[in-house]
Amino acid sequence: MGFKNNLSLVSVMVFALILLPMISGQTMQCYSGIACTDDGTCNDYCNPRNNNLGGVCLRRANCCCCYVSVVKSQESSLSKDTNNVFITN
């Protein structure tokens, strides 16, 4: 009975860790099978993969989840076209 409660708690925690960053404009990409001991281990794992926002260690799930920003800069959506068109009558 205790194992089932612990498993449910871990499932809810993993779900919350994935859902909350999505609401704030971030998402997470999780990598299973990573033997992590703390968040620093996951930061070292995430940074070379262009996940500069870091990551979190889910020890019980044996995985690292890296924060991935999904909000794009407004500047990148602007047109870079600098051609001026003059219309004369």
UniProtKB/Swiss-Prot annotation:
It is found in: Secreted. Disulfide bonds join 30-66, 36-57, 42-64, 46-65. One of its GO terms (cellular component) is extracellular region. Keywords: Antimicrobial, Disulfide bond, Fungicide, Plant defense, Secreted, Signal. Residues 1-25 form the signal peptide. GO terms for biological process: defense response to fungus; killing of cells of another organism. Its main location: secreted. It comes from the Eukaryota. Belongs to the DEFL family. This is Putative defensin-like protein 89.
